[in-house]
Amino acid sequence: ETGFWLESDRMLSLDFNPRSLEVQRQVVIEEFKQRNLNQPYGDASHLLRELAYESHPYRWPTIGKEIAHIAQATLEEVKDFFFRFYAPNNAILAVTGHISFEETIRLAEKWFGPIPARNISPRQLPAEKPQTAVRRKTVERKVPVDAIYMAFHMSNRMHPDYYVYDMITDILSNGRSSRFIQLLVQEQKLFTSIDAYISGSLDEGLLHVTGKPVEGVSLEQAEEAIWKELEKMKTVPVSEQELEKVKNRYESEQIFNNINYLNVATNLAFFELLGHAEDINLEVGKYRSVTVGQIQDTACRTFVPENCNILYYKAIK
């Protein structure tokens, strides 16, 4: 019950004053420095977002694009944001553990029921226009080695293609026997590390490929090697065995993931945000339904230069 009380108190009567704002401002600024300025490659995601998105707010990192954005936030702006969104009628509560449904409802009504609803404005975000040409950016930083970042526009979280994209990235880089690891790291020895993953964004997201080439391999050579493997996804159908392997891995990961109470609560809340919490039970089936033909068709539509954003992150010698 303490958790219900703490969260309801925060929602109802959060204390806004200049002193507390300044304390939290400094905390966030230090977090920005630690994650984005002082950490090697820390600003790469910021640079790639700005490159890939021209109109959608995804181009803005949640923490802010630069320290000035944090430093210049006023008390009135913070209060206005809070009172626009933090309300019971705009919140999802997920509770897991040794507690009954009836007790959960009782506590929710006790602590959140008296909090007045607020007028929540509809979510209206500008749509990102289709990309029509490759976008490139090169930066130099004090980092150990060069790195390449590539981002391709992909579907939103609710689109059926989302599951296809997730399977594609698993085929490319999930596990020692994946294509990138086996071919580009172990056999050709072009990369010390390489990864492919999707953003999982509610709106149209990004499929990322990131890698660090070995010493002596240029970023141009690294990019060429990546494109070669992506072309294979387009021209040579994935084998049923390879696809079944990543499906089995996903299903086993979901089973282990749901052992943890916090993971279960987080996932239930997320699927309720998407529309229905019970849809979480359909996920494995949706992944299982992905076909070889869908993999190839989606790869052909996605892995083209005009849909790609490329960041060369060069180490200052």
Q: Model-found features: residue ranges?
A:
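Charge-rich, well-structured scaffold segments of protease-associated domains
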Residues: 1-120, 138, 156, 187-317
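His/Glu-based metal-binding/catalytic segments typifying zinc-dependent metallopeptidases
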Residues: 33, 50, 120-177, 286
